[in-house]
Amino acid sequence: MTLNEVSEGLYVAAKFSELTLDALENLQRSLKVPNPVPREKFHSTICYSRVNIPYVVASGSFEVANSGHLEVWKTDDGSTLVLVLDSDYLSCRHMYARALGATHDFPDYTPHITLSYNVGPLTYKGEVQIPVVLDREYKEPLKLNWSADLK
């Protein structure tokens, strides 16, 4: 790994099965979520590191969670609705990245899937039973302006 590669940062995320994508879309509809994240954008961030690391993506498709709960997080851009996942797998993959030297901008890692980046003044809470099945992990150079891809 060259110095340039180390300094460019690394992004790793999990993408989910069609079964999970269907369930997430149904959840958005049943909750009447404003500004829903499109199906093809559903993911769970595993690593958002300002330095590159030799992360090896996992292969295989299996359930990584079967439950979670809804939370609204206040962000610089508004109120974001997330499904916080009860996932030891995603937490372990994040710890693997940290063990390899990944940085992390927050005090804790919270595995989640964003359902909307802007729900306005609405609030959501409650437990959710949903099959969260990993389709694949992927990695790419870190994009600091990732929110521009959402528009």
Swiss-Prot record:
Signal peptide: none annotated. GO terms for molecular function: hydrolase activity. InterPro entries: Acb1-like_C (IPR056175), Cyclic_Pdiesterase (IPR009097). One of its GO terms (biological process) is symbiont-mediated suppression of host innate immune response. The active site is at residues 43, 45, 112, 114. Transmembrane segments: none annotated. It catalyses: 3',3'-cUAMP + H2O = U[3'-5']pAp[3'] + H(+); 3',3',3'-c-tri-AMP + H2O = A[3'-5']pA[3'-5']pAp[3'] + H(+); 3',3',3'-cAAG + H2O = G[3'-5']pA[3'-5']pAp[3'] + H(+); 3',3',3'-cAAG + H2O = A[3'-5']pG[3'-5']pAp[3'] + H(+). 3',3'-cUAMP binds at residues 11, 140, 146. Keywords: Host-virus interaction, Hydrolase, Inhibition of host innate immune response by virus, Viral immunoevasion. 3',3'-cGAMP binds at residues 11, 140, 146. Counteracts the host CBASS antiviral defense system. Phosphodiesterase that enables metal-independent hydrolysis of the host cyclic di- and trinucleotide CBASS signals such as 3'3'-cGAMP, 3'3'cUA, and 3'3'3'-cAAA. Does not cleave cGG or cA4. Besides evasion of the CBASS system, might also enable evasion of the type III CRISPR systems that use cA3 signals. Belongs to the anti-CBASS protein Acb1 family. This is Anti-CBASS protein Acb1. It comes from Shigella phage SP18. The lineage of its organism: Viruses, Duplodnaviria, Heunggongvirae, Uroviricota, Caudoviricetes.
